[in-house]
C-alpha cells in the first residue's frame, strides 16, 4: 500500500509538471504571433506595394516621383468613424498633395466579411464623395498587417529619405472623430507640417480610433 501511494504521488506530480509547462509554451507562441503582427514603428522603412485603384490601375508609392512623402490612410466604406473622416481626408489631400505629401487611401477589409467594403462599392463611394486621391484595395489583406493597421481609419505619415519611405507618424487623424469643429489636436497635419519645415515630429504616435479591420476567418 505504501508503494502504491508513492507511485500515485509521483504520477500526480508528473501531471502537475505537464500542466505547468504546457501553458508556458503556448504563451510563448502567442507572444510570437502578436509580435509578428505588430507592424511598423516610427523610424522604420515602409516597403512599397502595388495595389489596385478604383480606376482599375495598379498603384505603387514609387509611381509618385515628385512626392516628398505620403499620408497613408487605411479606411473603408462602412465604418461610421471612417465616414466621419471622409471630408477631412479629402481636405488633407487637397492641402498637402501640392506640397509633396499626397493621401494614399487603402481599404484593408475583406468584402466577404463586410460586403459594403467590396471593390464596386469603393468605386461608388469614391465617386459619390469626390475622392481626389487613390483609393486602393488590399486584396488578400497582405499590406495592412505589414503596417500594423488595426482600425479604420489608421494613419501612417511617411517621408522619403535617401530613396526610402520612413515612418514618421502613426495613429489618429485628429482628436475628435465626431465633430471637426471641436478638434483641438491635428495629429496628422502637425506631423506633415513639421516634415515640410524640416523639423522633428513632436507627437509621433497616438491611438487610432475607429472600427476594427475586418479579417477573413
Q: Model regions: which residues?
A:
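Bacterial Sec-dependent N-terminal signal peptides
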Residues: 1-32
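N-terminal "domain-start" segment that seeds a small globular fold
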Residues: 27-62
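Short active-site neighborhood of thiol/selenol oxidoreductases, capturing the structured segment around
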Residues: 62-83, 192
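Loop/turn elements at helix/coil->beta-strand transitions in domains of secreted/extracellular proteins
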Residues: 67-70, 98-103, 129-134, 152
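Second-shell loop/turn segments in exported
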Residues: 77-78, 108-113, 177-181
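Structural microenvironment flanking redox-active thiols in thiol-disulfide oxidoreductases
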Residues: 83-128, 139-146
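Short, internal strand/loop/helix patches
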Residues: 123-164
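Thiol-/selenol-based redox modules, centered on thioredoxin-like
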Residues: 157-217
Amino acid at each position: 500500500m505504501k508503494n502504491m501511494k508513492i507511485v500515485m504521488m509521483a504520477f500526480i506530480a508528473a501531471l502537475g509538471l505537464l500542466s505547468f509547462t504546457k501553458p508556458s509554451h503556448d504563451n510563448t507562441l502567442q507572444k510570437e504571433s502578436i509580435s509578428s503582427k505588430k507592424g511598423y514603428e516610427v523610424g522604420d522603412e515602409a516597403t512599397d506595394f502595388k495595389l489596385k485603384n478604383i480606376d482599375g490601375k495598379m498603384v505603387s508609392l514609387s509611381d509618385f516621383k515628385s512626392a516628398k512623402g505620403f499620408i497613408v490612410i487605411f479606411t473603408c466604406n462602412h465604418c461610421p468613424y471612417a465616414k466621419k473622416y471622409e471630408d477631412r481626408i479629402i481636405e488633407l489631400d487637397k492641402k498637402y498633395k501640392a506640397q509633396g505629401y499626397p493621401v494614399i487611401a487603402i481599404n484593408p477589409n475583406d468584402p466577404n466579411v463586410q460586403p459594403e467594403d467590396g471593390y464596386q462599392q469603393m468605386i461608388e463611394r469614391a465617386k459619390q464623395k469626390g475622392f481626389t486621391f487613390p483609393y486602393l484595395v488590399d486584396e488578400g489583406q497582405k499590406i495592412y498587417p505589414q503596417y500594423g493597421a488595426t482600425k479604420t481609419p489608421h494613419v501612417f505619415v511617411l517621408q522619403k529619405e535617401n530613396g526610402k519611405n520612413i515612418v514618421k507618424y502613426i495613429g489618429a487623424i485628429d482628436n475628435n472623430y465626431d465633430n471637426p469643429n471641436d478638434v483641438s489636436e491635428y495629429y496628422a497635419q502637425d506631423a506633415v507640417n513639421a516634415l515640410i519645415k524640416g523639423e522633428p515630429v513632436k507627437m509621433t504616435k497616438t491611438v487610432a480610433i475607429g472600427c476594427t479591420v475586418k479579417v477573413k476567418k
